[in-house]
Amino acid sequence: MNILPKKSWHVRNKDNVARVRRDEAQAREEEKERERRVLLAQQEARTEFLRKKARHQNSLPELEAAEAGAPGSGPVDLFRELLEEGKGVIRGNKEYKEEKRQEKERQEKALGILTYLGQSAAEAQTQPPWYQLPPGRGGPPPGPAPDEKIKSRLDPLREMQKHLGKKRQHGGDEGSRSRKEKEGSEKQRPKEPPSLDQLRAERLRREAAERSRAEALLARVQGRALQEGQPEEDETDDRRRRYNSQFNPQLARRPRQQDPHLTH
């Protein structure tokens, strides 16, 4: 730590401190010079503006007199004389515009959109409505046809068919209801409880079936089927004992017996 102040790059070194102070003083001088130039430029610009303003005020009466004698300034219009005389003006086709107006008026009258003051909608239409037409002789009266619903409602044959359909539906519902009631009564009829002898026989049958299934499973695990009434004999010879297969007992096999004559 004592060597650190003697390094040339140390911030507290005398040379470095003097260099920093010299740079700061130079920066301050440059900033002052820049501000002086800005103020000088602003002063010159203001002086020039005031000079131009004074010249403009002195020459204003002369300009007003010159403008009074000269024509008005503006864009040059080469066709002003033609427009004043009415030449070169594009005019539309009056006949075509009149035909379009009449066609539009006819369509609006047919639709009932265009009506004049004091005119009804019926008068505005090109054809009077059907209720204002006189009835023709020997033909059907104008207007909509008689209501078909009223005729069908007053038809006696249709009424008879409707009553017959309701009767058949009612009879079918009664037949299905009677069958359902009969089946429900049979299902709800309580059954006779079994006797004790029947329950005991079923229990013994279940126990015998479970016992035989357990014996068959053990025999399959050990790799051989037990004969009924024959007790299982344990193999004492390790070389003849079956291979142990904990997870796949059906794949366990007995080792192959070797011929004693071939071994010697």
Swiss-Prot record:
Chain intervals with Basic and acidic residues compositional bias: 12-37, 146-162, 170-214
Residues annotated with Phosphoserine modification: S59, S245
Ribonucleoprotein among keywords: no
Chain intervals for the UniProt region annotation (Disordered): 1-37, 49-76, 118-264
Q: Which UniProt keywords apply?
A: Coiled coil, Phosphoprotein
Q: GO cellular component terms?
A: nucleoplasm
Q: Locate the coiled-coil region(s) and give their ranges.
A: 16-46, 89-115, 196-222
| Low complexity: compositionally biased ranges | 59-75
Q: What else is known?
A: Belongs to the leukocyte receptor cluster (LRC) present on 19q13.4.
Put simply, this protein is called Leukocyte receptor cluster member 1
The top of its lineage is: Eukaryota, Metazoa, Chordata, Craniata, Vertebrata
> Which gene carries the instructions for this protein?
LENG1
